[in-house]
Amino acid sequence: MEWFFVGRFESMGFGYDEYVNEDDTKCRQIWDDGYEEIFEIS
């Protein structure tokens, strides 16, 4: 699955990079501490 970079989001010195997949059905967040979350876009 290919991911496309959406943007960088930060709040109070902590943040994540956000990506969407090629058919816009999933969103992926990669946090500064290495935590990764993938969820469905409704």
Task: Identify the residue ranges that each predicted region occupies.
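Acidic, low-complexity, intrinsically disordered interaction modules
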Residues: 1-42
